[in-house]
Amino acid sequence: MRRNSNFSSLETNYLFSSIRQKIRSFREKHPEISIIDLSIGDTTQPLHASVIDTFSTSVRKLGNPKTYRGYGPELGLPALKEKLSEVCYRGKVSPEEIFISDGAKTDIFRLFSLFGPGKTIAVQDPSYPAYIDAAILAGARKIVKLPCTKETDFFPVIPQEENIDIFCLCSPNNPTGTVLNREQLKELIDYANSHGSIILFDAAYSAFISDPSLPTSIFEIPEARFCAIEINSFSKSLGFAGVRLGWNIVPKDLKYSDGSLIIRDWERFLCTTFNGASLPVQEAAIAGASLFPNLEAISKYRYNSSLLREALQKAEFVVHGGEHAPYLWVEVPSMIPDEDFFDFFLYQYHIAITPGKGFGSCGTGYVRFSSLGKSENIVAACQRLSQTSVYDRTVLSL
C-alpha cells in the first residue's frame, strides 16, 4: 500500500511540541515556581446547570427499554436546528439550511472534501493551522496565504492575480482576536460573488461579540447567501470543547457553476460519511441555546480579556484584539528576538504564551494570549505583568 502523498505535503511545525517541552523542562528545574499557561485556547468554565440536567436526563433514557433510541437523524435534531434558526439568526437562516455536526474542525475537512481535490484555497496569515492541514489532506492544488497585518487593520489582502476557489475566513479571528466589520465582509462577499468563489466562514467565536454593529454571522449580509458557508461551534459558547458539537449552514441559494445546488450534495455527503451527532449532546445543546446571548461563561472570558489588556498595556505592550474574542494579539518589542519570545515570557513573567509565528509568517513579532483560563490564573498573570514593564529587564534564563 502506497502512502497518501498528501501527508508528505504537510508543513512540519515543531513550535507547539517545543512549547510543551520547554514548560516541562522549566517545571523540572524550578518546581517552586508556578507557570500560568495562557498559550492554549481550551475552555475552563463548567457547563450550565440546565445543560447538565438535560444531558443527564437524556442519557438516563438510554438505560430504559421504553425510552431507548438508536440512530438519530444524520443532519441533526429538527428541534435544535429550529432553536438555532430562531435565537442565532432570527429567521435569516432556515432550519433546513442548518446541519448539526460533531465540531468545527471536522466540518472544515468535510467541506474541503465536498468540493474535491485540485482547488486553490486562500487562508488568512496568520491563521488557525488546521485550515492549511485540512486543505492539504483534502488534496488542495494550492494554498494562498492572505497577509493580515496591523497596517491593513488585520483585514486580508485579496490577491488580484489568483483565481481563488475557496476563501477560509475566521471572524472573530484566531489568533489576532480582531473582528471583520460589515463593510469589510461586504467587500469579501462582493469579490467572491464576482469571481465564483466560495467563502468558508468560521464563526466559532461569534458569541464573544458584544457590539451590535458587528456581524455575528456572514449571513447578516444578504449577498452572502450566494457565496458562503458558515461554520460554528458550541465549544466556547457552551463549554462543549470535550463534549463535541457544532453546526454549519449551507444556503439553498448556493450553487455550483453549472447551477446545481450545493446543499443537495452536502446532504448526500453527510448521509454517506456521518451518522449524526450524539442525541443526548444535541438535546443538551437545545437547553444551552435557550441561554443565548446571555452566557455567563462568555461574560467571564470577556472580563478576563479586559484584565489582560489592562495589565499588558501597563507593562507597555501594544495590544490588538480581545474585545470581541478570547485572544489578544500582542506586539513584542524588537529588542527581543522572535525566537526568544516564548522563553522571555516564561522566564520574565512565568507565563506560557503562543508565539505568533506558529500561525504563519505574518505572526512574526507577535504572541497570542488566551483569556479562556481560570479567573484566578488570569488575575495572577495580570499581577505579574503589571509589576514589570517589558522595558525594565529582559530575562531569558534563571
From Swiss-Prot:
This is LL-diaminopimelate aminotransferase. Keywords: Aminotransferase, Pyridoxal phosphate, Transferase. Pyridoxal 5'-phosphate binds at residues 71, 104-105, 128, 174, 205, 233-235, 244, 275. Homodimer. InterPro entries: Aminotransferase_I/II_large (IPR004839), DapL/ALD1 (IPR019942), PyrdxlP-dep_Trfase (IPR015424), PyrdxlP-dep_Trfase_major (IPR015421), PyrdxlP-dep_Trfase_small (IPR015422). GO terms for biological process: lysine biosynthetic process via diaminopimelate, diaminopimelate-aminotransferase pathway. It comes from the Bacteria. The keyword Transferase applies. It is an enzyme of class 2 (transferase). Pathway: Amino-acid biosynthesis; L-lysine biosynthesis via DAP pathway; LL-2,6-diaminopimelate from (S)-tetrahydrodipicolinate (aminotransferase route): step 1/1. The modification N6-(pyridoxal phosphate)lysine is found at residue 236.
